[in-house]
Amino acid sequence: GNTRTRENVIRRQLRIFPGDVYNQERIARSYREVMMLNFFANAAPNVLPVSEDKVDISFNVEEKPAGQANANMGYTQSIGMTGGGGLALPNFRGRGQSLSISFSANANQGSSYSYNYNPNRSKYRSLSISFTDPMVNDTKNLLGGSLFYQYRGGGSMYYSPINYTIAGANVMWGRIFKWPDDYFRGTWQFQMTRRINDADSPEELQQYAGGLEQSDGISFSQTIRRDSRDHPEFSTIGSHFSFKSMISGWILGGQENFQKHILNLEWYTPTFWKFVLMNSMKIGFV
């Protein structure tokens, strides 16, 4: 039933293979893994006896729309009218890869003769693009990266009057674990950012940016998570645990020195009929 998703993207999620001993638990796990891709409305397994000691197992998948396009508008007193859009393709080219692009800007981009121009409001624009391959060459390795850019002009309304530009990039590697079980996976990310500050006077630069015309942030983060939910969107059973630690500066270099640690716990308990109790806890410190 896969009309868009490539065959290998589905097969690499399966936990039972030709020649294996029949195992209901592994069939159920295969169904769960295919559904967690979030590319299919259904992936029901079908067991067909072919002899006294053999059966054929097929997974009848039903593709559903996975990509998203969005447009947005907003208004704030400091920036004014903003607009933007984005494109998210979680199943890019049917290979299970993820590609996303987003941008936004405000209307205060023209000269003082522009209808939308207000000298008290900040100019603003941002752009980001990211790509992730969750199973490179059908292995248990994840590779990804992103580029991002943001500019905000100075304005006297509520916020800092200096102009600043932030640009950066990151690369990420991940791996599915075998221990304690294969619900665990880890990702490691290295990120570099640069902020350029532009002020009208040294006094403003000192007051709002600590006297720095340019600052670099170099960080490394690790995320360990375990996800045993039965569905990525409307989970009815299972749990999701993640612990992320980030360190910036110090031995890595740059002018931004901090540590950040976040623990997130979610677990789902079926109650009665179609009602599910979801409990969550989130703890973090910087």
Locate predicted features.
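N-terminal periplasmic "start-of-domain" segments of outer-membrane beta-barrel proteins
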Residues: 4-19
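Glycine- and acidic
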Residues: 12-16, 68-69, 247
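PPIase-associated folding chaperone regions across multiple families
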Residues: 75, 253-255
